[in-house]
Amino acid sequence: CPMGIDLAGLVSMARHGMFKAGLIPHELHEVAKRADETGSPLGITADKFEDRIEWMADEHDVEIPVDKEKADVLALMSSIEIQKYPQSIAATAQIMKAAGEDWTFRLDGFEATNFGMLSGNPEWQKKATMKIIDAAIKIGAKTVVLPECGHAYMALRWQGANMLGKPLPFKVMHITEYLSDALDKGKIRVKKVDKSVTYHDPCQVSRRGGATKAARNVIKHLGVDFREMEFGGDYNWCCGGGGGVVTITRADPLRRRVFKLKMDQVEKTEADQLLSACANC
């Protein structure tokens, strides 16, 4: 907003009112309820996550620490990664190993997404957030690294302290921020990539979250031909499916119209590949 009005904050208040009035879209309510009951919007339990970890450790021949009593870094996953892109689990382990990190996954605090926030139910939001905070405090983590999810960044990085009631005793980094920092410090190195790429900014990470430069620094290290969209960075246009809209069937026509606008911007760059830091996007 050019006048500095926090529109997203007003939307959050409206969501809360809709939830209390029983007017939340039923699809979004069911996903949020499942997340509250099982710990994950896709029903990923701790046992299933552990199974996926064992599978990926064997598949990619990499050690993946789980439930270490003490660690400097707590890494989180999103349910969509665990369910649909489990190689992200192994990739995280490979990155942490290359960076020389003392890190772990925790079965009592692994899910980064927060549908309590999206549904407008602050009780569900706090419950999901406190699982992560409690797990991080338990192991004495200095840093919590968040995965691809945009709203997960907002929920913990910018609203987590409100849930705890005091400043968080650890640093919160989106995976793009972690990679950017690790590359700048020489903790990890990457091969140069001969491609042209453009980048879609997740709204909650870039414009609202403030981590706009991190992904671009990672892209710079890759040495690609980077083609910024006409509306990129803090001026990025939404993908059309954020804020839980992707779960709401009757919103599909609107979501597709917004997505068409976004894809027109992408195609104008004539880039070989589109990158993003949010699986939902």
Where are these regions (language model features)?
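Redox cofactor-anchoring modules in respiratory/redox and cofactor-processing assemblies
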Residues: 180-281
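Helix N-cap/beta->alpha junction signal
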Residues: 148-151, 176, 277-281
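Active-site glycine-rich loop that binds ribose-phosphate moieties when present
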Residues: 126-132, 178-185
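Iron-sulfur-cluster electron-transfer modules
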Residues: 1-147, 151-155, 159-160
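Short, structured coil segments at secondary-structure junctions
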Residues: 99, 166-168, 222
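Short, structured patches in soluble enzyme cores that scaffold and shape functional sites
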Residues: 77, 148, 174-176, 201
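Short acidic, glycine/proline-enriched helix-loop-strand junctions
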Residues: 153-176
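General small-molecule cofactor/ligand-binding pocket signal
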Residues: 104-106, 171-173, 227-229
